[in-house]
Amino acid sequence: MAAPAPSLWTLLLLLLLLPPPPGAHGELCRPFGEDNSIPVFCPDFCCGSCSNQYCCSDVLRKIQWNEEMCPEPESRFSTPAEETPEHLGSALKFRSSFDSDPMSGFGATVAIGVTIFVVFIATIIICFTCSCCCLYKMCCPQRPVVTNTTTTTVVHAPYPQPQPQPVAPSYPGPTYQGYHPMPPQPGMPAAPYPTQYPPPYLAQPTGPPPYHESLAGASQPPYNPTYMDSLKTIP
């Protein structure tokens, strides 16, 4: 994934934070005596005194303007309507001597070179991080987009079916005869319906019936001789 490109405001802020090149804070200076009213622009500082000023790069020699030393510094910088050839010659002579200073030219060259280098680096960074730049398209070809599709299959096991319970056989229950009311006789009050209760269940015999000798003897056939003898012995 490409890094986000720096915005224009960020680049402007970086350029503002760079140190200014030499001569950016120049001053107006009056190089020769009080009679000379032609000001000269100094790239670094104006040094000397109010009556004798010259350009220099040493901040310790910089002239300090105040009302005691130079009560009217601005009036001395007024340009006359007509310039004499002597004034022009002296100004050109001072400019040629100032231009021959190698330190001031070297500082300006270094400042310009650093500024161009910073702008070049910022341009390269923008081109390699911005997708709309030609260098980005040449160095970083577009990759095909591969879409991975994952399919998840869920298998549901059948729930166990409950075993059928055996059904008990149904026996026919006892039938009860309903109560049939009698029609009321004329002049007789109607009797209330009696409460019907179901008949009690017949108790099942728990054992064989008791043995009775009389009943056992009566059940024997009359032609049995044993039966006849038993009757004779009974008092």
UniProtKB/Swiss-Prot annotation:
Any single Gene Ontology cellular-component annotation: endoplasmic reticulum membrane
Function recorded in the entry: Can induce apoptosis in a caspase-dependent manner and plays a role in p53/TP53-dependent apoptosis.
Induction: Induced in a p53/TP53-dependent manner in response to cellular stress.
Leader sequence residues: 1-26
Domain notes: The proline-rich region is required for endoplasmic reticulum localization.
Membrane disposition: Single-pass type I membrane protein
Tissue expression from the record: Spleen and thymus.
Keyword flag Endoplasmic reticulum: yes
Location in the cell: Endoplasmic reticulum membrane; Nucleus membrane
Disulphide bridges: none
UniProt feature, compositional bias: Pro residues: 159-172, 181-211
A Pfam family matched in the record: Shisa_N
The protein's name: Protein shisa-5
Biological process according to GO: intrinsic apoptotic signaling pathway by p53 class mediator; intrinsic apoptotic signaling pathway in response to DNA damage by p53 class mediator
Side Extracellular, residues: 27-105
Cytoplasmic side: 127-235
Binding partners and assembly: Interacts with PDCD6; PDCD6 can stabilize SHISA5.
Domain of life assignment: Eukaryota
Cited InterPro entries: Shisa, Shisa_N
Primary location class: endoplasmic reticulum
Keywords: Apoptosis, Endoplasmic reticulum, Membrane, Nucleus, Signal, Transmembrane, Transmembrane helix
Segments for region (Disordered): 157-235
Transmembrane segments: 106-126
